A protein has these predicted regions:
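C-terminal, charged and often intrinsically disordered regions of DNA end-processing helicases
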Residues: 1-38, 267-270
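Metal-dependent nuclease catalytic regions and adjoining charged, substrate-binding loops involved
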Residues: 6, 147, 179-270
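Short, polar/flexible loop-turn hinges at active-site or ligand-entry regions and domain interfaces
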Residues: 28-37, 54-59, 162-163, 232-233
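Solvent-exposed, amphipathic alpha-helical segments
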Residues: 43-54, 224-228
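A non-catalytic, helix-rich entry segment at domain boundaries
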Residues: 47-121, 128
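Mg2+/Mn2+-dependent nuclease catalytic core
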Residues: 118-119, 123-218
Length: 270
């Protein structure tokens, strides 16, 4: 059995990309194998989170690089099987550490952490819409300027996508700006994406109209999700991304057969 009562940016983007993918992840909750890219991102995020534990003048690239080993050890202790599967030998571990170092060097070309005192790091945020749907997720970093302006920061360990493929990340940041508004009645001043792989940033300043548009967009999307749940209409959508989807072997669009949909016992707004 499953309940559809909450939505995160990643699951929302899953549905936009492919309703069946959303179902298999959010309702069936089928396991997926770990990937090197995801693990590398988790490692770099952990190092950047801990970087701000150091005194301001010690937040250097040397301190960050020195934090790779301890962060990796903590992840290995938490999930030794995944680390052993992805990085079975010293050569693979060394390559991972070098890749992490390169990404961290990229971060230091984008800002000076010595001048920042984040208000929050890796913060779980949530807020409820009027229809009962809970919006939730994790914000990498929240900064508050002396004048009170709020900046939400998200680290991306990949490269900045071309404009036609930037919608997913843009929606994610608008989603968090909406959650901030709903929970604090405060308009976020700046949304900033740091693409460490390409050493570039994307900065946006949301308006009240942007917040209203995002809420309407999410409500419309949730209506589509609710209808799919009520009719069991989780249609697959073939795209070039199918080649990277773990569920391709059981996808009807590719000749597969998915398992029966688990019973859905509750849907927000219904």
């Amino acid at each position: 059995m499953a309940e559809l009562l909450a939505l995160s940016p990643s699951r929302a983007n899953d549905f936009v990309q492919c309703p069946l993918k959303f179902r298999l992840r959010s309702i069936d909750r089928l396991p997926e194998p770990p990937s090197e890219a995801e693990f590398r991102g988790t490692l770099v995020h952990a190092v950047l989170e801990r970087l701000f534990d150091a005194e301001a003048d010690e937040r250097t690239i040397e301190t960050a690089v020195a934090g790779i080993g301890p962060a990796l050890d903590a992840l290995r202790e938490k999930d030794p099987e995944t680390v052993a599967q992805l990085f079975p030998g010293p050569d693979e571990v060394s390559r991972l550490q070098q890749q992490a170092r390169t990404l961290l060097e990229g971060y230091f070309t984008l800002e000076l952490p010595q001048k920042l005192e984040p208000a929050a790091r890796e913060e779980f945020v949530r807020a409820d819409l009027d229809n009962g749907l809970t919006l939730r997720g994790f914000v990498d970093r929240t900064d508050i300027a002396p004048g009170g302006h709020v900046r939400l920061v998200d680290y991306k360990t990949g490269k900045q996508p071309k404009p036609q493929y930037s919608g997913e990340a843009d929606f994610q940041m608008r989603f968090y700006a909406l959650v901030h508004w709903l929970s604090r009645r405060e308009l976020v001043h700046t949304l900033q994406l740091f693409y460490l792989g390409s050493r570039t940033t994307v900065t946006k300043r949301p308006t009240a109209a942007d917040i209203e548009r995002t809420e309407a967009e999410i409500l419309q999307l949730w209506e589509q999700i609710a209808r799919a749940a009520e009719s069991d209409g989780w249609r697959p959508r073939r795209t070039p991304l199918c080649g990277w989807c773990h569920f391709k072997p059981i996808c009807p669009a590719w000749g597969g057969t998915p398992p029966p949909t688990p019973e859905i016992t509750a849907i927000a707004g219904r």
